[in-house]
Amino acid sequence: NLIIHKAVTVDEALDVWGHSKIGLNIMTWHKYGMTERIADICLSGAVCLTDASEYLRNNFNNNENIIMYDLSRLDELPGIINNVLSDDSFRKHTADAAYLLAKEKHTWKIRTMEFLRMIKGENNK
């Protein structure tokens, strides 16, 4: 079932994504980066369905740990959603891979450690 929620807080969104198979994201102002929403969707156990950004193309694998769509081809979105929802194995594999990647690279703890290394002038290893 498609559920379109009214506006929710960040905490409420985490609960919604935790009960969802897919979290739909639109990269409004972050065309070269990533938003917290993407990490939150991945960490919730849902498949993240988002338009692409340079950062996402370089740090995620489309159809492996994220599903990216093209805003100029929105007519393809219903088919993409149907494919994800009709193949439980693919959906679960994608969500699990996204969770592992987000847990390894996209938590606030990881980001804090990266910032501290930058401040100290260390490389990002």
Predicted segments with their positions:
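Catalytic binding pocket for nucleotide-activated donors in carbohydrate/polymer assembly enzymes
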Residues: 1-123
